[in-house]
Design a protein with these regions (language model features):
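Hydrophobic alpha-helical transmembrane segments
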Residues: 1-165, 169, 177-307
């Protein structure tokens, strides 16, 4: 029941503005990095190890030494704050609102807060495409993968520990997991661990996303075909799966060349219909986010309680 309540709280309220675990995790990563940084694989491994232990050990101790009621409150708060359904919707909707007002400059600025690519040179179509890509990818990273590790951890009595460990790795990847001069070696373990941890959730979650969105597809057979043919068309081993699911549902073209920190990466395209992307396409992507997240929650609860 606590999993369901935490999920619903996130849907209604969204992320807490104060005392958010991710802010604490991010600040801790910065402090450890400042202390041990050298662009070496071993130092990057230590960053990963120390950050996980700093958070997981106290949670495990609290689980085993405090009253059950106190731990349940902590558990509820952690789950609620680490599932990002509402915040993903809320932050990306700001870009949509700017597009509705034809304020491209503001849309590019707001988009830069939710993607890691350079948004300064994007046109309206590219903004819409980037928005759909980030919603689809973060449906996995921000919702489905956390639920997956929550369920997996519950089977071994370490649900919160595994959820927090996943979010730490995910945060590390977003902060140091780049193939640039500074982080090529130092961020290697964080990036690779994130790839491994998302491997199963990306595949299961993308299938759930595809099934959730087939109602909105004009050609179900074609949607499935696009997904199957394009799911590996990404430099990341996982990002192509949710993007291919959405590209199949909407019958649009995603991915392609993108600029990150001054470097242009020539990615393969996902999908082949180069039609204009509309705001309605983004609305459908939101529906897939909410439907697939809800379905996955029910699947997760079924796994935990053996339904």
């Amino acid at each position: 029941m606590i999993y369901f309540l935490a999920f619903i709280t996130d849907l209604i309220i969204g992320d807490p503005f104060k005392f958010h675990p991710i802010i604490k995790i991010g600040n801790t990563i910065k402090k450890i990095e400042k202390f041990i940084y050298k662009d070496k694989y071993f130092n990057g491994f230590l960053l990963l190890l120390f950050t996980i232990l700093i958070f997981i050990i106290p949670i495990y101790i609290i689980r085993n030494t405090t009253f059950t009621f106190i731990f349940l409150i902590l558990k509820y708060y952690i789950i609620y704050s680490l599932i990002a359904t509402k915040s993903l919707y809320k932050e990306t909707l700001k870009v949509v609102d700017a597009l509705k007002k034809n304020n491209i400059k503001e849309a590019k600025k707001l988009l830069s807060y939710v993607v890691s690519r350079d948004t300064t040179m994007l046109n309206e179509q590219q903004i819409k495409k980037a928005l759909i890509e980030t919603i689809s990818e973060n449906t996995i990273d921000g919702v489905i993968a956390p639920l997956f590790y929550l369920a997996l951890g519950a089977k071994f009595g370490i649900d919160i520990e595994l959820l927090v460990a996943y979010k730490i790795v995910n945060t590390l990847d977003s902060m140091v997991g780049y193939k640039n001069k500074k982080y090529r070696k130092f961020g290697y373990f964080s990036a690779k661990t994130d790839d491994y941890l998302n491997f199963i959730p990306a595949r299961i979650g993308s299938f759930v996303m595809l099934c959730s969105g087939l109602f909105y597809s004009k050609n179900i057979k074609k949607s499935i075909s696009i997904f199957l043919k394009n799911r590996n068309n990404q430099t990341s081993p996982n990002a192509g799966f949710p993007e291919a699911a959405i590209a199949g549902i909407l019958d649009i073209k995603l991915a392609g060349p993108s600029t990150y920190f001054g470097n242009t990466i020539n990615k393969l395209y996902i999908g082949n219909n180069d039609r204009l992307i509309t705001l309605k396409d983004i609305t459908i992507t939101y529906k897939v986010l909410f439907i697939s997240s809800s379905i996955f929650l029910l699947l997760m609860i079924g796994v935990i309680y053996g339904v």
